[in-house]
Amino acid sequence: MKALVEYLNHKKLIFKSLQEILPKELGSRKKVSLYVGVDLKGYYALVMQLEKKSRVLRKEAGDLMALHEKLEKYVGSSITKKYILIKAPLCSHAKAMLEENGWKVWHEPE
């Protein structure tokens, strides 16, 4: 988590609080790290971290957006800012789909 906080500071994002939520709590078996934080203006933000060897396709991007909706119900509040850090090969259609739906995508190919 320390590496993630340093990465977010590098991107000029500072949170008052940042807590990890396990995908298992949302009924998901995805290998993804979920962090919900409150920024300095008081808005909820979601930071997803995804690391894998295979390509992230458009179908999986849809699954990640569905996970965001489940997380909003779990937290009981609207999450306005959505960030995703992907350390895997990324399909251009999946990236476009995420960006169209308000996600800020940081892609670091391995």
Question: Across the structure, where does each feature detected by a protein language model lie?
Answer:
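Acidic-basic catalytic patches of nuclease active cores, encompassing PD-(D/E)XK
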Residues: M1-L34
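Sparse, context-dependent recognition of short Cys/His-centered cofactor- or disulfide-binding micro-motifs
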Residues: A3, Q19, S33, Q49, ...
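Conserved catalytic cores of phosphodiester-cleaving nucleases, focusing on short active-site segments
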Residues: L22, L26-G27, S33-L71
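Short, compact, well-ordered microdomains
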Residues: S77-E110
